Amino acid sequence: SGYAPKAVKEIQGHDEMAWRKLAQLITALENEKADQKMVEAVRKESLNHKVPVLGITGTGGAGKSSLTDELVRRIRLDQGDALRIAVISIDPSRRKSGGALLGDRIRMNAISPWSSGQRVFMRSLATRDFGSEISAALPDVLAATKCAGFDLIIVETSGIGQGDAAIVPH
């Protein structure tokens, strides 16, 4: 992709430009258009970043987005809004267009900037035709998000069936 970053250092940091570059890289990963050297660099660099990944899964309508929002809110309150949190929300793809429904963002109130500035990065991923409740790009997206320097990564699956255990290895 023409806009995707070419070096890991471009996605590191917590300013708007670094987050924009991270979002562009995620888009390139999702569309399988990321520079292969960059993908390898991200995979290698991510091994140096031990970031907890919390997977939230369940059936449709179980309250995954509400739970995610409440967890983010409480973490921000309990930690004095000091932690940087990434939320990766995996949405089912529409069969016609292949795009994500993006319904989760409607329920997310705690992701907006508070007095200490932007602390929560949220990105939706489409399942595409992967045949799972997670995106095929998820492992590389998690690697990129770890490289970006977040303190916690929350992954919310699409929850479309009983195969939600696919999040466990991540």
Task: Go through the PLM ranges and name each one.
Residues 67:
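Hydrophobic positions on the alpha1 helix immediately C-terminal to the Walker A/P-loop
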Residues 1-53:
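Extreme N-terminal, non-catalytic leader segments
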